[in-house]
């Protein structure tokens, strides 16, 4: 790790097709082996499927899904005197959004379905309706933090 200054955080430019920063971040999470155009096609196909099924704006539904999957607290391991405690900590907004996007992609890939765009569309619609694996993961994370509330004084 560099002893010099911390790396400058580069701003995320909005996606030109959807004019959304979140869409741009999602494309980066979907991308495998540098194939950005494939990731963009998957997201645009998923958005068109969402528009067909719901009749509403897919980008708004996507933003709702990300908001519903974003955790507010998480547990982090902390060693104190030979014992490791799961210490609940608040999640910064950028980290929470990144975790939500990561979970949405992970659980979309794990779904049963024909194409990745169909699986992603299904997971996004479920997350927007506060169901689905990514929202369940957020609830589990919150439950873990609640269960380990006694160790909150070990925060760092």
Swiss-Prot record:
Keyword Nucleus: no
GO cellular component terms attached to this protein's record: small ribosomal subunit
Name recorded for this polypeptide: Small ribosomal subunit protein uS7
Stated family: Belongs to the universal ribosomal protein uS7 family.
Molecular function terms, GO-annotated: rRNA binding; structural constituent of ribosome; tRNA binding
Signal peptide (UniProt feature, chain positions): none
Top-level taxon of the source organism: Bacteria
Assembly information from the UniProt record: Part of the 30S ribosomal subunit. Contacts proteins S9 and S11.
Keyword terms of this UniProt record: Ribonucleoprotein, Ribosomal protein, RNA-binding, rRNA-binding, tRNA-binding
SUPFAM superfamilies recorded: Ribosomal protein S7 (SSF47973)
Function as written in the Swiss-Prot or TrEMBL entry: One of the primary rRNA binding proteins, it binds directly to 16S rRNA where it nucleates assembly of the head domain of the 30S subunit. Is located at the subunit interface close to the decoding center, probably blocks exit of the E-site tRNA.
InterPro entries: Ribosomal_uS7, Ribosomal_uS7_bac/org-type, Ribosomal_uS7_CS, Ribosomal_uS7_dom, Ribosomal_uS7_dom_sf
Gene Ontology biological process terms in this record: translation
